Regions:
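Active-site-adjacent structural elements in enzyme catalytic cores
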Residues: 1-181
Length: 181
């Protein structure tokens, strides 16, 4: 990663822009979860229906506090790490984040660049795989640039983690595995 990339990406996010960044398994596309226009732009870019919902990543549990009612101890114990959990959202969480789902998908990321970006932006971020409509997720910055070109506002140039698959998604209340890893 080039010096200054993190701060530049964080400023773009705070202004409502879209940024690609490395995560545990693949590149993620992210933005400010509460910036409606940014989230809807991201969904259009991916060709993803709003009703599918989105994952939020954070550097720590404090960044998730404005979005969730509580984080169970067994969930906290799995973080930071490649574990995404469905938890109860606050009533104020907009539908463009949760989609048709009663719970919100959240993760405290273990990827150092993704975590540093959340810290630099001062917020949890939307995190969805860098692909279009069910395609194979981009695993390098070059793949991201080839897929999206100038449609993104910024790409952080670094490498993804060594996770062998996307993070599993599990319901924190029922324990049900919603998406295998």
């Amino acid at each position: 990663m080039h010096p200054g990339e993190l701060q530049q990406a964080a400023q773009i996010i705070r202004r409502g822009g879209l940024v690609a960044y490395p995560t545990e398994y693949c590149f993620g596309l992210g933005c400010d979860p509460l910036h409606r226009a940014a989230v809807l732009r991201l969904l259009r870019l991916k060709r993803r229906p709003v009703d599918k919902g989105l994952i939020l990543i954070a550097a720590d549990t404090e960044q998730l506090a404005r979005y969730v009612t509580e984080i169970p101890e067994h969930v906290r114990a799995s973080w930071p790490g490649p574990h995404t959990w469905l938890v109860e959202p606050r009533e104020s969480v907009p539908g463009w984040i949760t989609g048709q789902h009663p719970r919100l998908a959240v993760r405290v990321t273990a990827h150092p660049v993704a975590a540093a970006l959340c810290k630099a932006a001062g917020m949890a971020l939307v995190s969805t795989s860098a692909n279009r409509g069910g395609g194979v997720p981009a695993r390098t910055d070059r793949e991201v640039e080839r897929l999206f070109g100038r449609e993104l506002d910024f790409v952080i140039h670094d490498v993804v983690g060594d996770a062998p698959a996307p993070t599993p998604i599990r319901d924190a209340v029922t324990g049900e595995l919603v998406r295998p890893g």
